[in-house]
């Protein structure tokens, strides 16, 4: 992959992850999304943020408590969501949001996409953990 993003769905998912991660450190919704979308653009002007990116970020933000509750229910005994790394927590929220609430994307596609992003931003162990947890929500009928 080159240093610049295209505008593929995977790239926009990755930017959504970056925006959500930034927001965990105090960034607000629009500025975090704009930064994630513009940070590697050649020109200095801001670009319109694609609706798909905004939908993912806004969806995770609006469903964060519900997503966290679902994730907590599926962690091993003795584990808490706070024990997870911020990277893994953010990816679980993003992947789970797309699987549970974003019907435009088939579950398996959402799962595979978040696994590929996890491999880039985390390690193989985390990618397997995310796969194991999120695969419980993937419908076999797809």
UniProtKB/Swiss-Prot annotation:
UniProt entry keywords in alphabetical sequence: RNA-binding, Transcription, Transcription antitermination, Transcription regulation
This protein's GO CC annotations: cytosol
GO biological process, one term: DNA-templated transcription termination
Pfam family, one: NusB
Keyword RNA-binding: yes
MF terms in GO: RNA binding
Signal sequence bounds: none
Record-linked InterPro entries: NusB-like_sf, NusB_fam, NusB_RsmB_TIM44
UniProt family annotation: Belongs to the NusB family.
Function: Involved in transcription antitermination. Required for transcription of ribosomal RNA (rRNA) genes. Binds specifically to the boxA antiterminator sequence of the ribosomal RNA (rrn) operons.
Protein name as it appears in the record: Transcription antitermination protein NusB
């Amino acid at each position: 992959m080159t240093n610049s993003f295209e505008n593929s769905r995977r790239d926009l998912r990755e930017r959504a992850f970056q925006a959500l991660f930034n927001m965990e450190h105090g960034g607000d919704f629009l500025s975090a999304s704009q930064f994630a979308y513009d940070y590697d653009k050649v020109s200095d002007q801001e670009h319109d943020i694609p609706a798909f990116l905004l939908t993912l970020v806004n969806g995770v933000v609006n469903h964060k408590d519900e997503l966290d509750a679902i994730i907590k229910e599926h962690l091993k005994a003795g584990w808490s969501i706070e024990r997870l790394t911020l990277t893994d927590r953010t990816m679980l929220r993003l992947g789970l949001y797309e699987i549970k609430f974003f019907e435009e994307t088939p579950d398996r596609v959402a799962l595979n996409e978040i696994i590929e992003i996890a491999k880039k931003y985390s390690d193989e162990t985390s990618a397997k953990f995310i796969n194991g947890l999120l695969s419980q929500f993937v419908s076999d009928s797809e």
